[in-house]
Amino acid sequence: MTLILPKDYHPSLTIRDTEAAIVFIRENFQDKIADKLNLQRMSAPMFVEKSTGLNDNLNGIERPVAFDMKAMPDDTIEVVHSLAKWKRLALKRYGFGMHEGLYTNMNAIRRDEDLDNFHSIYVDQWDWEKIIAKEERNIETLKTTVKQIFKAIKETEKELSARYPGSTYRLPSDITFITTQELEDRWPDLAPEEREDKIAKEKKAVFLMKIGDKLKRSGKPHDGRAPDYDDWELNGDLLFWYEPLKRKIEISSMGIRVSEESLKEQLKKAHTEERSDLPFHKMLLEGKLPYTIGGGIGQSRLCMLLLGKAHIGEVQASIWPPEMIESCKAADIKIL
């Protein structure tokens, strides 16, 4: 997606009022999500050792920011892309019990991100993970959890609207569940991104399930997913139709995590079976890690959505190409 400059856009809040609203959204939403999912806030790393295999490989082509450190010259340190695998290990290390979980304020750098209205090299999200029983690894558990997150977003919207009545973007009351295969069957000639826009415009709020495995018609995945955290049959993305930009906006990517069996199967499909020898993967394959559900919820994305902003740079401080900054300035988009 390229930069979209909506016509007649004018922010309804000053920069300082926007900053106050951001704090209000963040504090309210994280309290609600912690309560609904039984999560405890925990400290999280900004970087991990490459040798542990704990970093998120995303689609497998993005380069992590990496460096060495004086005290450990023989190892490469990587800035995290996300904490998808770290959280599952942390639940075991910190002694969390059944149906207990954690959330973190995760900050990441994704240097290879294609920049546009929704995407920045700086990623901030609530990364969360919760222990479930093996028999709870099913679609119903996934849907129930999505509904709890959706409810937390709606409650935050209501409270924000009471404080900033003219500056809150209105969200739909209900959410629709649909699979990537159903989208391909309905619109086989469209690209995956176009299908997402179509269904989001039609339903307004959608949880798109089963991302990562090959689709039947095209023989290609709807979108890339690393093989070693989400179970591709039990995951999905939370999407909203965003009228100011006339596009869908993804607020969360989440899923029930791989079991020993599905990890083995997905590593094979992804031709990355060598990861089986990494410490995290060994523990998982040996049944030493709890079964979990987890995901990431974009902090800046949620603020952008609820405040009706035209660019994510209005709700977070990052680095943008000079020509993008100039184009935004001309369109009254106030980049921080």
From Swiss-Prot:
The record, for Pfam families, names: AsnA
Which PROSITE patterns does this entry report, sorted A to Z? AA_TRNA_LIGASE_II
The biological processes this protein is annotated with in GO are: L-asparagine biosynthetic process
| CDD domains associated with the record | AsnA (cd00645)
Q: Which domain of life is it from?
A: Bacteria
InterPro entries annotated for this entry?
aa-tRNA-synth_II (IPR006195), aa-tRNA-synth_II/BPL/LPL (IPR045864), AsnA (IPR004618)
User: A Gene Ontology molecular-function term?
Assistant: catalytic activity, acting on a protein
For this UniProt record, the keywords arranged alphabetically read as follows: Amino-acid biosynthesis, Asparagine biosynthesis, ATP-binding, Cytoplasm, Ligase, Nucleotide-binding
SUPFAM superfamilies hit by this protein: Class II aaRS and biotin synthetases
According to its UniProt record, where is this protein located?
A: Cytoplasm
Q: In which pathway does it act?
A: Amino-acid biosynthesis; L-asparagine biosynthesis; L-asparagine from L-aspartate (ammonia route): step 1/1
Q: What is this protein called?
A: Aspartate--ammonia ligase
> Quick one: which gene encodes this?
asnA
